[in-house]
């Protein structure tokens, strides 16, 4: 037998059971094309034990009924015919725990609907659950009973399908429809949309590499950052788009490596170029000494990626003129011709003096040889 869960389009008024049955078929067959699903209940004409009742429901419909709220209980109580043996429902004790067999979820305290003094587990064999319908006392309530007893099977046909929530959420049957409880990171009536995060950009002086398994800069997207030579990363090197639409970490920045600032030497000057920032990676400084001073050290130094200069700052030292400088190669260019001239004049004077001495000596010898 089949009887309907009321559809939103059903008209008010008294209907015969046949009309209700026809209305149910039309509602559940046509409305899904317009986004509405009906949830119908079914029950067996004959009684059977709990195991066979579940087989009957799964073979012909979806499963034994899973009661979700009081409104459903009220509707079942109002609509189902009285059956002296009552109806099996989809709850069973598994490992001493009452469990919804359709979802394999534990029955919570909030969802319990036991009759007075139930469950009592008489003879320690009452592991299945029936629902009282049109009973004088505790009607609509549950009772634990032995699974071998024979009762009518109370089944349902669900509108939820594996693809109902795009496999990104839990489909929950509701009156005239179903509702999707989306998994983290998804949203929408059928969980068809993915949570988005703000797009990221590569930092200056660096690069960014991202993977987007579900869409650009969306849930589960991951981005990794790297800095170029001569700069260092400030912040986290990796970040991920979370289910809330926020990144796990803020975008990092790449800061250029700094070297110690330099100053011009005493008695000299310094000229520097700074392509990236003052006294930072690739900065270059050139030193010059004033007149009468000598440069001690390298004339040029460059800031390296390690944060150190290629050579220490030079100094300017006053020049000391001496002949020893000639040997060292440090002398004034005018010194050589002057020295040559002095040497030449000195040699010439010596030759003239020597010639005069020889001439005087010759004359003296002649006088001694001639007495008269």
UniProtKB/Swiss-Prot annotation:
N-glycosylated. Calcium-dependent lectin that mediates cell adhesion by binding to glycoproteins on neighboring cells. Mediates the adherence of lymphocytes to endothelial cells of high endothelial venules in peripheral lymph nodes. Promotes initial tethering and rolling of leukocytes in endothelia. This is L-selectin. Ca(2+) binds at residues 118, 120, 126, 143-144. Residues 55-155 form the C-type lectin domain. Residues 156-192 form the EGF-like domain. It is found in: Cell membrane.
